[in-house]
Amino acid sequence: MYPNSPSQGRIPLPLPCEQQQPPLEQSQEQPLQPQPLQPQQASGYLSKLPVSVAPELLSPEQFIQASINLHNNVNFARMLMNANLLAVPPVSPPPWSYRDQSPLISPASPSSSFQNRKRRSDEGNIAYDVKRQKFQSPQEQTVNHQAVPLRGDLGCSYPGSPAFPLLQSPSPPVLKGHVPNSGECWLYDHVDTTLPVAKDKLSKQILELFQALQQQVCDLKKKDICRAELQREIQQIFPQSRLYLVGSSLNGFGTRSSDADLCLVLKDEPMNQHTEARHILSLLHKHFYTRLSYIERPQFIKAKVPIVKFRDKVSGAEFDLNVNNVVGIRNTFLLRTYAYIENRVRPLVLVIKMWANYHGLNDASRGTLSSYTLVLMALHYLQTLPEPIIPSLQKKYPECFDSTMQLHLVHHAPRNIPKYLSKNETPLGDLLLGFLKYFAIEFDWSKDIISVREAKALPRSDDYEWRNKFICVEEPYDRTNTARAVYERQKFDMIRAEFLRAWVALRDNRDLYSLLPWKGIMKKMNSL
């Protein structure tokens, strides 16, 4: 179980700086009202500041908050006065106001102490949430909060934490342009999962493997529960953020052992992945490592799209977390539509992924092909048959897959696209054989680009994205090369050789065992 989950009815683990506090008495005593600081009090507070922190760095609101907290939690007041802000759970600074009166001062106002000021080297990492508040406070929406909680409605930084008075951390408003949470509406919608009829031996083997390995609803629910729990944790640092499940867990091509991809969205605008995203992920990596007992082996990987990899001890699932890589949200629903538009697509793609994984072709971190690239290659093959099995959805339904569509519409737009009725009735076994043959001897790797967007092979241009690349697979939305990880001639030759070997073996034997020990894989998967 997740120790901080409110659904479990448990009090979260106390923070290191917390002390057990007696419960607040439900009496008729007068609520504590903020009192202005007397000169001698202010002097006493200032004397507690370290030499490296100038008194003007603390705003009047912080002094008011400290004076109130002094009556309720001595340890917390001492922590604030000693400027030990790293121990304070990060909370985005809200506007300050007294009930119905106008705000005293706004953190965004020119007079705010932290505005337009670089952090000095001797200040350490003081209040990084304030420094990074541009990621947390949307410009189009203003949320009013009660700045000084009274005794009857003291806020807590962590749900259920006992007697730890802080500024109330509000429920974050939904950012404009974001898709709904995966657990809210569409995640468990019924989709047509009718399988094709298999008459030959090879097609039956493919279907049997698919039915044993495909992701189950229970697997998806476990991942989504962890996503929801992590979203609550991350919103303690970035209150305006939303966390989305993307990739194979949602696009229909996942297996029971598939990793789960998460996209943390902080703002609508594109984010610099080299600077902003890395900074945010470094904060989250530290938070996961030090605060979350159910997160195991968090790793911060500084790739082109940086991620934090970790394992959830509760579900046993592996997760990859990125920040603001919103193209992943768009292509998740594009691929999901392809997955269910024709009933041969999912079984074929799954067996291709299992074959590639078994032979070491499915690991972008080791210079081979990512799962996403393999899916695009399979879809491209089905589009380029003399009688296509699937069309280009972006050409046939451009209004549903517009790259400029607001994110909150992305999941809804393709839901009413009907099944594609192809005249091509080729069985699964022949489609698998044709896929291997196409990339073994027919596709021109040196001259062509694989394009699902155009449903054909495009001639290579001299653009930097395609120049001197061994394999070129176009991302349907941002049109980058999803196969850029294959940058070594040795790895490219290995991939081509395996396609050729697999095609010859399957052509001669017409048995899935010639590609991989599929029954052993099924047995191993069922034991998980």
UniProtKB/Swiss-Prot annotation:
GO terms for cellular component: cytoplasm. Component of a complex at least composed of cpeb1, cpsf1, tent2/gld2, pabpc1/ePAB, parn and sympk. Following oocyte maturation, parn is expelled from the complex. Interacts with rbm9 and sympk. The keyword Zinc does not apply. Residues 16-32, 102-113 have a biased composition (Low complexity). Mg(2+) binds at residues 259, 261. It catalyses: RNA(n) + ATP = RNA(n)-3'-adenine ribonucleotide + diphosphate. Its cofactor is Mg(2+); Mn(2+). GO terms for molecular function: ATP binding; metal ion binding; poly(A) RNA polymerase activity. Gene3D superfamilies: 1.10.1410.10, Beta Polymerase, domain 2. Residues 1-41, 99-121 are annotated as: Disordered. Its EC number is 2.7.7.19. It comes from Xenopus tropicalis. It is an enzyme of class 2 (transferase). Residues 428-481 form the PAP-associated domain. SUPFAM superfamilies: Nucleotidyltransferase, PAP/OAS1 substrate-binding domain. It is found in: Cytoplasm. GO terms for biological process: mRNA processing; negative regulation of miRNA catabolic process; oogenesis. It holds the Pfam family PAP_assoc. Belongs to the DNA polymerase type-B-like family. GLD2 subfamily. Cytoplasmic poly(A) RNA polymerase that adds successive AMP monomers to the 3'-end of specific RNAs, forming a poly(A) tail. In contrast to the canonical nuclear poly(A) RNA polymerase, it only adds poly(A) to selected cytoplasmic mRNAs during oocyte maturation. Plays a central role during oocyte maturation by mediating polyadenylation of dormant mRNAs, which contain 5'AAUAAA-3' sequence in their 3'-UTR. In immature oocytes, polyadenylation of poly(A) tails is counteracted by the ribonuclease parn. This is Poly(A) RNA polymerase GLD2.
